[in-house]
């Protein structure tokens, strides 16, 4: 795999899991990753990116988000992104241990491009490969 400079955002409140995800992404050639502790931090970053006047692709090519986080959860973050004309093209992957049938339906309703359970980190990289090509 060729190293990609496209920027990936990871919103995850667990330090251990975010380090695991980012470490695995780095090993897979995705070195340009920005980490947020919750959906609110990620949303603030995206809002500032829009205000910069530069292409959004300079700031985010893909977003990986946990579902349950403080301040703003992954479903709310996804809905905000997918209802924003400047951001809706960015793929959002919900990556959580909480993907029940009910939560999968909610993820689809808010516009998540993919939903995957946390133990499937190899599958996460395969999904990112597919969504950003």
Protein language model regions, located:
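Receiver (REC) domain active-site loop signature in two-component systems and cognate sites
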Residues: 69
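Two-component/phosphorelay signaling modules centered on CheY-like receiver
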Residues: 15-41
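Conserved acidic carboxylate
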Residues: 12
